[in-house]
């Protein structure tokens, strides 16, 4: 038990230093998008807001999903870094259980780590998507959340609706940060 406390405390310090959303307690069991249809979900999504993460340090974030095989979606995440370079990572998202197709596990080609949860809580497929992920680490949980749009902007009404869903799930939307999607600033992403 003492070893678990030391590991948990060490993890807490590391994650706090890297701006991860580490919270006390186990991951909640949240409802996901009913009748999720991955064929309608594929395509390009713009990141509007996110919980800060160690692995996303840029702006102009996009996620492009493509069909690979039944239950598997190709993933291409891109972002513009402060130095003007474009950072990207390639992976795949797999449906964890066929009975819950909105619960996917994402793994990336260049990262030797276990797959991470990617749960679609809400999406109309045409304008918005709300994604949540959570992993348990002993006494703590590590949370991720993204508000995505098919366009670089999102209406205030839709944004508030997505934030309300997160709030009802126990995720503080005030901890989220906006992603710069300014057309001029993000122009290098279109080259």
Sequence positions of predicted segments:
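A beta-rich soluble binding module of mature secreted/lumenal proteins
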Residues: 2-191
């Amino acid at each position: 038990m003492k070893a678990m406390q030391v590991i948990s405390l060490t993890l807490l310090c590391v994650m706090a230093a890297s701006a991860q959303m580490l919270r006390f307690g186990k991951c909640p069991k949240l409802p996901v998008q009913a009748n999720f249809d991955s064929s309608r979900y594929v395509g390009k999504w713009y990141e509007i807001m996110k919980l800060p993460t160690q692995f996303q340090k840029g702006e102009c974030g996009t996620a492009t999903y493509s069909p690979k095989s039944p239950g598997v979606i190709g993933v291409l995440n891109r972002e513009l870094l402060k130095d003007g370079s474009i950072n990207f990572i390639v992976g795949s998202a797999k449906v964890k259980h066929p009975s819950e197709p909105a619960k996917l596990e994402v793994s990336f080609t260049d990262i030797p780590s276990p797959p991470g949860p990617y749960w679609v809580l809400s999406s109309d497929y045409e304008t918005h998507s709300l994604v949540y992920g959570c992993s348990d680490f002993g006494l703590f949980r590590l949370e991720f959340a993204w508000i995505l749009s098919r366009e670089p902007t999102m209406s205030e009404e839709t944004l508030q609706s997505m934030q309300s869903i997160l709030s009802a799930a126990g995720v503080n939307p005030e901890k989220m940060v906006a992603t710069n999607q300014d057309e001029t600033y993000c122009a290098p992403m279109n080259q």
